[in-house]
């Protein structure tokens, strides 16, 4: 997903949040897709083993409003169709990757249509600001009522990573809350290595207090199609460092839509700010040939790798306290 974060960030603060519409009340439980005392059954069954109860995970889901024919700039959080889609897709297949690393919180928010990124001056900016202001309000409510000083993992994908990057800049970067940052997982967007003033790109698997990011593409795809990633921050979500290559046997597993885990499925190769992967080895690999890139799978493709790494970082953070 291509856009200028610097521009978006500047526009956000120049706007003075003047474009925000009616605020969402996050004291209402139904305005949360996930809280630790209200995990949907479809999500609960994805959790494997024990959970770190001294760490929280604040998760923000990716863009689901993709239909070019849909005229809406934002989704109302009471839209039953999208609520069900959120619960049964990104909550189930993405957020679950962090379920063992801490207590999960995920707000419903009025996310922006995908067109917002390419039309900042023609409605896109206001659309993204509405979405971010919801995420921001939910995060403030979370801090004031739920967190109680625990470590914090920020996790998201695509548009979710957009909003989390702004939370990092507004609430963590050089602020007191930075001491509670376990890690920020913000894949699916292009970030600079120096995107934040005091929050580093983490290049060790047990490192804490920083961020990790990546964008996944097909290995045989014409690399010119991903040229906008050139020079962007990237780590290998199999090795959790900047190693340029990881063989299939190091891949811990990706979660497919049939809820099955496929291990040792592909090689990963870092080049020009992108994680290039070989065609996954699994029973439905023919589906991969129809895809131009694997953006939609930035989390699912590395689900078990993320799960294990998030547990490791939570453990490392708690040992340092």
Language-model-detected regions and their locations in the chain:
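Active-site catalytic motif of lipid deacylating hydrolases and related acyltransferases
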Residues: 61-149, 282-300, 304, 311-321
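Loop/turn elements at helix/coil->beta-strand transitions in domains of secreted/extracellular proteins
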Residues: 53-55, 100-104, 148-151, 178-182
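Structural recognition of the beta-strand scaffold that forms the well-ordered cores
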Residues: 56-60, 105-108, 153-154, 183-186, ...
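Flexible, membrane-associating and regulatory peripheral segments of lipid-active enzymes
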Residues: 17-87, 91
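Gly/Ala-rich beta-loop-alpha elbow adjacent to hydrolase catalytic centers
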Residues: 156-160, 164
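Short, hydrophobic alpha-helix immediately C-terminal to the catalytic nucleophile
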Residues: 165-169
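Surface cap/lid and interfacial helix-loop subdomains adjacent to catalytic sites
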Residues: 131-148, 170-316, 320-321
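Bacterial Sec-dependent N-terminal signal peptides
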Residues: 1-20
